Amino acid sequence: MKVMFSAGEASGDTHAASVANALKEIDPSVDMFGMGGTLMERAGVRIVYDIKNLGVIGIVEIVKSLPKFFKLRTYLKRVMMKEKPDILVCVDYPGFNMKLAAVAHELGIPVLYYIAPTIWAWHSSRGNTIRKYVTKVASIFPFEAEAYRKYKCDVEFVGHPLLDIVHPTMTKDEAEEYFGARKEAKKILLMPGSRKQEVLSLLDTMLKSGEQLMSNHEDIQFFLPRAHTIDRSELETFIDAHNVPVTITEDHTYDLMQICDVCLAASGTATLETAMMELPTVLLYRVSPITYGIGKMVVNVSHVGLPNIVAGKEVIPELLQDSVTPQVIVSLVEPLLTDVEKNKAMRSELREVHHKLGEPGAVKRVAELVYNLGKEKCNE
């Protein structure tokens, strides 16, 4: 059986790799290929297009990159025609993957969409398009599954994949030793995003905040887990321009999260990961003014951060656009560093978010759906 994956971002690479590993447990002979990154490659997926070449995040940025996406879709269509996969697994990246799903449908290839478009948040009309082109939606939120059912899509709630992935592998003492963390130091985690554009937009501000925090605390450490879509040298160039000693880490991010006091995170999957590790977080979100303005008109949710959307209220503070300044960041971080009760209170609310996400096993359930759909096509 042949399985084609399409993931366009670091988080999608992570989730696709988990499914690929689970598929190998079901059938070690499965042939997997597609668009992705290093984690998918390690999981045994032949990478036909490396996602390092992607990385736009807003409407304006997407418009500028349209010619590249048209060429990529044409290239992947040729790959499909040559490889003849039994199923296409689209993972997140809806602006591109929706178009690729239409191509697969045209070629008679079943499509499973995992981490599907957020029709519950915006662009609900996509529900009709998904019903037309997608064979099965593997939904990660219960309220999301209900939204898809309203459009008569074939959807199955599988649970959230992070429940299978997010957990420490070391004790706190072991993690402190591994990362060179001082027990008494205040420890801040910096997660500026997985796309170069996010990093360009947010890391400079994070580091300026770090400079102010260093003047307030004698013993403070900063850690930055490197997304595998960002070169280490690019991060080092940014960091060298500031008087902030940052430890760039390459692995064991969840072990790192359990020893940190506060996280500054770009909006996205990282905020749900920190929620599941019960790490107090300040969310930062900044895109072009045009992208933000259009987004405000079409998005129908009251929060940006996934933990807040799941909770139905603000659990972690959200700084948007012009509010993303060192002064405002420091004003929110300081109480979480100095007020033990405030820190504990946020951790308690994040624990509730964790509970609302359901039970582990999502990855295995998705792999079984992929395998069964692919086998049906394979046996035709």
Cite the ranges covered by each PLM segment.
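Nucleotide-activated sugar donor-binding and catalytic core shared by glycosyltransferases
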Residues: M1-E380
